[in-house]
Amino acid sequence: AGAGFVKARISPRFLYGKLFPCGIYCVEGERGMRICFVTGGSLAEFSDRWQEAQAEVVVCGFQALGEVSYERELRGETSLFEDVALLSREAKNVVIGGCFTDARGMRRKSVVVAEKGRILGVSDMVNRIDGSLYRAGAGVKIYETAAGKLGIIVAEDLYFSRVAETLAVCGADAAVCVFEQFSESLEPMLARAQAFLCGLPVLLCGYGYALIADIGGKVRFASPGSPCVYDLEREQEYHLVETRRRGFYRSGRKGF
């Protein structure tokens, strides 16, 4: 690819991709949910390029918004959440962005979700490891959008399989995980495992890298470029799983 273009690694099942002059690499499969990953730069930098992507869902890493103070947002000193809502209104899509929220000194890793000009909600990381600087929030959330039911996994919650299991049981069409900096191979491996075990695609977006794991546990898409676009086909499969185990013993009553 020439200068300014983004490379992507795709599954052999897809026959071709397109290189757009705007520098966004789009891989075409069966038409489904078009996802745009922003793995570098701020939201303001991407806000001038959203028309190039024509995506139904835009997923931004933590670098896009950075630090967000609820108090300063309420006082009007900053407008980061408003910027997310405005971008979703202009693009007429769903915008998902990671950020570090501060509520009177309580810092959390969070993900804000907006659709067509409206903030749908903010999801916080629900698990705290070894007394981390970032506090645990409450509740795993699924957002019903025009693009489908999107479940949110915040950062290190990816390490806890119950989060993805909860999203799958509650009917999410896909799990979107916004991470910070990936280790060498741990997070992609976990995304693939949870996609296979829970039966829902896992979209992983972090600094400098994006990945999609399909329900077969395979890497459907991966790219270090920003922004990059992929058409995610909708997949849902159900299987009867039976387990033989000890316990649950009940003796019959006698002497009726």
Protein language model features and the residues they cover:
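Active-site catalytic loop in hydrolytic enzyme cores
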Residues: 103-170, 189, 237-250, 254-256
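Fold-independent oxyanion-binding glycine-rich loops
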Residues: 40-41, 62-63, 98-100, 116, ...
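Cys-nucleophile CN-hydrolase/nitrilase-fold catalytic domain and related Cys-dependent amidase chemistry
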Residues: 43-116, 183-192, 196-200
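Short, Lys/Arg-enriched N-terminal segments with co-localized hydrophobic residues
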Residues: 13-32
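Extreme N-terminal basic, low-complexity initiation segments
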Residues: 2-14
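CN hydrolase (nitrilase-like) catalytic-core segments centered on the catalytic cysteine
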Residues: 76-94, 161-228
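Active-site beta-loop-alpha substructure in enzyme catalytic cores
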Residues: 34-60, 64, 134-198
